[in-house]
């Protein structure tokens, strides 16, 4: 059984800006979303919980530089996408 990805309006805007700024990783980004939908615990995603201001959110890696933050609703098998961008920019949640 697969997971349902929830694309909020805010995430969709951030993702569009991210893809515009980083067209070279569209294939990696797409593969990350596909794998997240099939198995969010796959080792290549490097799923881990965040701490501090982002406590309660999780992160998966697109590659070594970029990641996606997300919420999971385990009972519903839903994943709400929150942000996408550079690893260093997640402290302010500004996106890319």
What name fits each language-model region?
Residues 12, 51, 91:
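Nucleotide phosphate-binding site architecture
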């Amino acid at each position: 059984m697969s997971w349902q990805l929830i694309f909020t309006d805010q995430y969709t805007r951030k993702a569009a800006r991210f893809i515009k700024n980083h067209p070279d990783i569209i294939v990696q980004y797409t593969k990350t979303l596909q794998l997240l939908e099939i198995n969010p615990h796959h080792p290549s995603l490097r799923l881990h919980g965040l701490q501090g201001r982002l406590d309660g959110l999780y992160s998966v890696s697109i590659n070594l530089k970029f990641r996606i933050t997300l919420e999971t609703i385990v009972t519903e098998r839903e994943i709400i996408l929150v942000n996408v961008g550079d690893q260093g920019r997640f402290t302010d949640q500004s996106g890319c």
